[in-house]
C-alpha cells in the first residue's frame, strides 16, 4: 500500500543527500546548490531505486497561486500529495510510501505544476538502502508547449469534450500523463518538458503572466523563466535532444491588451511576422543542437485551423533551409474539445504522436 502524507515518522530513517550519484535527474533544474536542486518546469523529475519499506522526501515549496500537489510514481503507481501555501518557504517532510514489501522499488518524484510553484528538493530518507540509479534512456526528447503539454485540467474526468469546470484553480492539473510525457515514455526517451499554460510565441500575447504577458520567445532559452523565481539563462550544452516537439499556436490569438482574441493569423502582415519569429527560434535551436528532428504541432483543443496552415508553411520553409522539420496533425486536430483535453483525450493524442515520431525518428 502506498500512503502519501506529511506525517512525522518515528521509525529510524537513513538520510540521502540530493547530490548522491544514485539519484538521476531529468529536466531543466538549478544545481547551484547540489544538495538543494530547484525545479521550475512541470515534469522535471528525480528518479531512483531503493530497497526498503518506507520513503520520505524533504521539500521546500513556494505556491504562488492555486491548489497544488507534489507528484510521485512508486513502482509504476502515480500518486499526489496536496501542498499548502501555509508552508511556503519551509522545509517539510513528505511521506511518499510506507508499509511496502522489503524489496527493490522504483521511484520518480516530479514537479506536477508549472509557474505557479517553485519546488526545491532537500533530501531523501528511507528505512532501507539506496540502489544504483536507473539507467537513463539514450533517446532524448524536448518539448516547448502550452497548458496541454503541462497537463492542465487533465484530471477533470467528468468534463471530457466540455468546457473546463469553473474555478478549478489548478487542482485538476497533472503533467505526468500529458500527451508529451506519455509519448516520451512510449518511445523510451528522456524528456525535458518546457511547457507553460497560456503561453504564446510573442511577449505581450497569450495568457501567461498577466498583465505583463511573457511569450516563448523569452522562455525557450531560460532555466528559470518566471520573474518570481528569478530569471536565469539555460546552458544548452547540458542537454542535446534528438527530437524537439514545438506545440504552440493555441494561445497566440490573444493580443494581451483586451479580452478579445483578435489576432488574425490570416492577416498576411501578421502571418509573416509570426512565421518569421517561429522560424528564428527553430533555427537557433537547430544550431545549438546540431540538427535534431523538429516536430511542429498544435493539439485537439479547438482553434482556427489557419494556425496549422501557417505551421505547415513554416515546416516547408524550414525544410528548404535544410532543417529536419515535420508537421504533425492529429485526427481531431483543433476540433475535439472546447476545454482542456482530459486523460482520455491525452491518451488519444499520445498514441498518435507516438506513431508519428516512431515513423520519423530512425
What are these regions (language model features)?
Residues 140-144, 149, 191-194, 242-247, ...:
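Structural recognition of the beta-strand scaffold that forms the well-ordered cores
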Residues 293-362:
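Extracellular serine-dependent O-acyl
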